Amino acid sequence: MYIKVKFLKNGEPHGREYTYKSTFPVRVGQEVILPGGGNGVVTEINVPEEDVESFKDKIKEIESVVEEDEQ
């Protein structure tokens, strides 16, 4: 599934949304670990494939989901 994520800065969502692929079950508001080790928060799930068609070959996949007790 395609999701939208905002990077975390000082623990708060910051900046614009970026699109990632996720093979993990995620929900809006959940913290995820991004490629390269940064963290972000999910702002949208189930982004339609037609919305990302023009750049889907460049979309990276999230590395994992931060479990609630890890936050």
Segments the model singles out, each with a brief description of its role:
Residues 2-71:
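Terminal, basic amphipathic appendages of nucleotide-handling enzymes
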